[in-house]
Amino acid sequence: MTQKPFLGFSDTTIDHFMLRKVGLPTFYGQAFLPDVCELDRTMLPYTRQYFEELLTTGRIRCIRPSDTVYESRKDFGESQLGTPLAAKKLGGFRLLQGSGQFSGEILGGCIDSIFDMFDPSRYADMPEICRKYGLFPAKEEWRGRILLLESSEEQMAPAKYQKALEYLKDAGVFAAVSGVLVGRPMD
């Protein structure tokens, strides 16, 4: 791969939108500390599979559900070296509506950060800056894409989550995308 991949999730959501605006491809996913540098003896199998695919091909063709969900680490100290994460078997994706298969490029990120792009309650100037520089993609840019949403450890209240979804609806996102993937919340 000749291009250097930009990887990350959650706190890097705005970075992804900014880099996309200037034409640089990004990959929403693996973060350095919790994924690439997993403290157990090896990287988690699901993470390793997609990380290696990205590094060898420069893209990720198909996202399949993990059959296992892992508890997030609360401590990244030396005592955690070689300690496996608690795991639980799952049945894969949970389909809420529509077809279980859809395709398109992924666009989205942490719903908390996306909310901040529209709402000034946390950062008063954020919505103005995002509008001024066109950081949030226009409705046409969402056409045929897959909206990816995940939540932060702040565990957004249901009313705020609903408001965030309403911002996306008002921006025409749901009418334009080919599908929506929502990450499993932490804990």
Residue ranges of predicted features:
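Conserved active-site and cofactor/substrate-binding residues in soluble primary-metabolism enzymes
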Residues: 10, 14, 46, 105-113, ...
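Conserved anion/nucleotide-ligand pocket segment
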Residues: 25-112
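Structural motif
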Residues: 7, 146-150, 181
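Short, acidic/small-residue loops that bind anionic groups at enzyme active sites
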Residues: 2-21, 25-33
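Oxyanion-binding "anion nests"
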Residues: 106-158
